[in-house]
Amino acid sequence: MADEALSIYDEIEIEDMTFDANLQIYHYPCPCGDRFEIAIDDLRYGEDIAVCPSCSLMIKVIFDQSDLPKEEKKETEGVSVKA
């Protein structure tokens, strides 16, 4: 989706957003009373539009990849397989 086709409510610096480490999302208050949300994985893959789940408003998140928290490596449990 091209940004020109979207109706963007505002542009917000990522430093002004709140990061929820448990849910791995950034959020920012929406005028409707809910909040804009965007997943950190979406940001890592180049997505920069946060949406409000309660209304039609969207914001553009201004950030550099270096602004994002380091990606946590998920440890996998070793599984032994006997043939």
From Swiss-Prot:
Any one Gene Ontology cellular component term annotated for this protein: nucleus
Alphabetical list of PROSITE patterns matching this protein: DPH_MB
Gene3D superfamilies linked: DPH Zinc finger (3.10.660.10)
Domain DPH-type MB: 8-64
Keyword Repressor: no
Pathway annotation from the record: Protein modification; peptidyl-diphthamide biosynthesis
Annotated InterPro entries: DPH3/4-like, DPH_MB_dom, DPH_MB_sf
Catalytic activity as recorded in UniProt: [3Fe-4S](1+)-[protein] + Fe(2+)-[Dph3] = [3Fe-4S](0)-[protein] + Fe(3+)-[Dph3]; 2 [3Fe-4S](0)-[protein] + 2 Fe(2+)-[Dph3] + NADH = 2 [4Fe-4S](1+)-[protein] + 2 [Dph3] + NAD(+) + H(+)
Residues that bind Fe cation: 30, 32, 52, 55
GO biological process: protein histidyl modification to diphthamide; tRNA wobble base 5-methoxycarbonylmethyl-2-thiouridinylation
Subunit structure: Component of the 2-(3-amino-3-carboxypropyl)histidine synthase complex composed of dph1, dph2, dph3 and a NADH-dependent reductase, predominantly cbr1.
Domain notes: The DPH-type metal-binding (MB) domain can also bind zinc. However, iron is the physiological binding partner as zinc binding impairs the protein electron donor function.
Name the UniProt record assigns to this protein: Diphthamide biosynthesis protein 3
Native organism: Emericella nidulans (strain FGSC A4 / ATCC 38163 / CBS 112.46 / NRRL 194 / M139)
Protein encoded by which gene: dph3
